[in-house]
């Protein structure tokens, strides 16, 4: 959408697109920035929540470098990381240790007294890594199930974008024109090439989010240190009192 970050996937004009003959795959996605932590390393990532039919849209399984691309095995959710993200975190596919994803609480305010309540977190295991040979994907993307992304970012039926795979005989530019006429001025329609330019702006937003999250985590650390310091002082007073009493 041109205004705001999300669209409602249950809106009639959106649902109609899935029925068009030119559309082979209709895929709602959520893209939001988050902080990814693995052991003592951390970096900002672009979390992309996708539905089960994502492999029909992207054929991402063809660019997997390690592990097997899967986002859910019926019991556990998984994440697939760009090879650059995985390398900087030092994590490999099928690691017994999960990565942690943290994002600001979209519906709440920053709570400086208890910063942990200011963001949502998820622990999730890495099923695979992929290499698209494009830095905008390899160095920032973390793909998770759409349902998990909606929980993490407090969405229900919303999506930040709808990605489409067209039939082989469909002209991309002509279809984009038809789509703009159908949706009107309320939505942004972009071809694959135009989408790459948009990702450059996402990179800037990603680092801003990283700085904000780092600041919140730093405050949380200082709060813990302060609380421990006060506890030590109180305990020392108790020890001194007991010693004075001859204990």
Regions found by a protein language model. Give the residues of each.
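A generic structural signal for short hydrophobic patches within well-formed alpha-helices
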Residues: 55, 85-86, 149
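Basic-flanked hydrophobic alpha-helices used for secretion and membrane insertion
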Residues: 94-186
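Hydrophobic, regular-secondary-structure patches
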Residues: 1-46, 52, 56, 62-75
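Structural motif
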Residues: 18-24, 89, 187, 206
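Short, solvent-exposed hinge/capping segments at secondary-structure junctions
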Residues: 81-96
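A residue-level structural signature of the nucleotidyltransferase/glycosyltransferase Rossmann-like core
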Residues: 77-78, 141
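Peri-transmembrane interface segments
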Residues: 134, 168-225, 231-234
């Amino acid at each position: 959408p041109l205004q705001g970050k999300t669209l409602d996937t249950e809106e009639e004009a959106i649902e109609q697109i899935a029925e068009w003959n030119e559309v082979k795959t209709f895929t709602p996605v959520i893209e939001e920035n988050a902080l990814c932590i693995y052991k003592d390393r951390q970096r900002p990532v672009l979390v992309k929540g996708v539905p089960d039919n994502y492999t029909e849209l992207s054929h991402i399984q063809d660019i997997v470098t390690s592990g097997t691309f899967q986002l859910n095995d019926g019991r556990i959710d998984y994440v697939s990381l760009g090879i650059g993200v995985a390398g900087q975190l030092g994590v490999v596919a099928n690691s017994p240790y999960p990565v942690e994803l943290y994002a600001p609480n979209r519906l709440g305010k920053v709570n400086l007294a208890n910063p942990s309540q200011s963001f949502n977190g998820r622990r999730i295991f890495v099923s695979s890594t992929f290499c698209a040979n494009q830095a905008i994907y390899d160095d920032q993307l973390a793909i998770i199930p759409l349902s998990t992304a909606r929980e993490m970012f407090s969405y229900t039926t919303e999506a930040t974008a709808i990605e489409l795979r067209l039939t082989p005989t469909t002209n991309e530019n002509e279809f984009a024109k038809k789509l703009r006429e159908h949706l009107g001025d309320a939505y942004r329609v972009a071809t694959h090439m135009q989408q790459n330019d948009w990702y450059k702006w996402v990179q800037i937003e990603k680092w801003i989010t990283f700085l904000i999250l780092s600041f919140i985590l730093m405050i949380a650390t200082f709060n813990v240190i302060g609380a421990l310091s006060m506890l030590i002082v109180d305990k020392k007073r108790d020890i001194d009192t007991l010693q004075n009493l001859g204990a």
